[in-house]
Amino acid sequence: MRLAIVRQRYNPFGGAERFISRALPALERAGTDVTLICRKEAGWAARKVLRVDPFYVGKVWRDWSFARAARAAWRRAGFDLIQSHERIPGCDVYRAGDGVHRRWLELRSRVAPLFERLGMALNPYHRYVCAAERQLFEHPRLRAVICNSRMVSDEIRRGFRIAPEKLHVVYSGVDLAHFSPRKRDELRGAARAELGCQPRDTLFLFVGAGFARKGLGAAIDALKLVNERSFWLVVVGTDRESRRFAALAAPLGERVRFLGGREDVRPLYAAADCFILPSRYDPFPNTALEAFAMGLPAIVSSRCGAAEIIEPGVNGWVCEADDVPGIAKLMHEADRALRTGSLPQAARATAERYGMDEMAGKLSVLYANLAREAA
């Protein structure tokens, strides 16, 4: 089968990009001939790339022009199946890794001040994305939507006129050899020494771009409420508002570290004791699976798809977004539970259910079924 995967841009810290980069070899091992359609091939390490890079000014023009050019390119090439990771109406398969934009705007509006809500309502890019999203999900050519969590599947089913049988929940996969407890043991001592933390310190790790959406403010406020000198928060990721969050964390001094984006986060997973992501909206972060694979338990919010694989007290905990006292309580609970020694094994066992080959196998079955239906 000749499969085209469509993703506009490469961001080395992006979850969708990591998914594609790791899924490509697994799909090829399963016998799929994969071509990546993108603006620039740098960074992807794909064997087959079809570049489409039309001129643009501004975000709306950028996305519209790429969608138009990508559709023209895949029609000329005659692929068996088109899987888009962008909101492009007319594809065969859409992977909803970014969730539902309209749902995120609804959740964001609940906590945003008046002027921010007004700006969101008038923002032409939000209007464009919501319109493209509706056209995509309700397009007659769309045959399947790959949802990376039940949460996303439910949001699409409730929000759009789409047949439920088109929705398929396929959790992301994780490279179990690249992220492993053995690697954590190798890196842990040096990584903690570099950070300057003591053996008895409890290090919570936050990994993600888009700090407000990922709930960094609540994590910082929870650390203030905990008021434990031995609790640290290490932040890995980039954000346009980094300075604002750094100012919020300033009273905590060295106990909050902003490390910026990292292409290899394994040393930080190794240094950490618990992963934390109290997101306001997060379809299913790859970073949660990476943390599990390294043997880290996780605290995530109920608005995060990773909550679906959390067993409270066994491999992690589920909090409510923006519930600062609740998050602080779970940080204390995590600190106590980490001393029992069973959490790392349970976290790793969770990740082992979601290897890359398992994910590729499920996708290959879906592609084969779609091919049979088209025959």
What residues fall within each predicted segment?
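A short, well-ordered alpha-helix in the C-terminal region of glycosyltransferases
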Residues: 190-193, 339-353, 365
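A short, active-site helix/loop in glycosyltransferases that binds the activated sugar's phosphate group
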Residues: 134-169, 174-181
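A conserved mid-protein helix/loop that constitutes part of the nucleotide-sugar donor-binding site
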Residues: 17-22, 202-225, 243, 325
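Aromatic "clamp/platform" in nucleotide-sugar-dependent glycosyltransferases that forms part
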Residues: 261, 280
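Glycosyltransferase donor-sugar binding loop
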Residues: 41, 174, 207-212, 232-245
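Conserved acidic donor-binding segment of nucleotide-sugar-dependent glycosyltransferases
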Residues: 312-313, 317-324, 333-338
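A short helix/loop element that forms part of the nucleotide-sugar donor recognition site in Leloir-type
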Residues: 180-197, 344
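Short hydrophobic beta-strand element within catalytic cores of glycosyltransferases
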Residues: 297-300
